[in-house]
């Protein structure tokens, strides 16, 4: 079985403090979320966590887009 990095680790590659991009802002804010499930890969578990705890995420659509990008990267 091939190694698959966590969603958090992927998300951290999207950080950019100078960007107004929604995914970059999500990544910037997630970096400061001390309880973010950093080892998680599962969409449902991440989605549940964010819906309940991530007041910094204005729309779950942003997470959905970021997760699709993560899945695309993990295919290669």
UniProtKB/Swiss-Prot annotation:
Entries under SUPFAM superfamilies matching the protein: YozE-like (SSF140652)
InterPro entries named in the record: UPF0346, YozE_SAM-like, YozE_SAM-like_sf
Family stated for the protein in its record: Belongs to the UPF0346 family.
Name recorded for this polypeptide: UPF0346 protein lhv_1069
S-S bonds: none
Domain of life of the source: Bacteria
Pfam families in the cross-refs: YozE_SAM_like
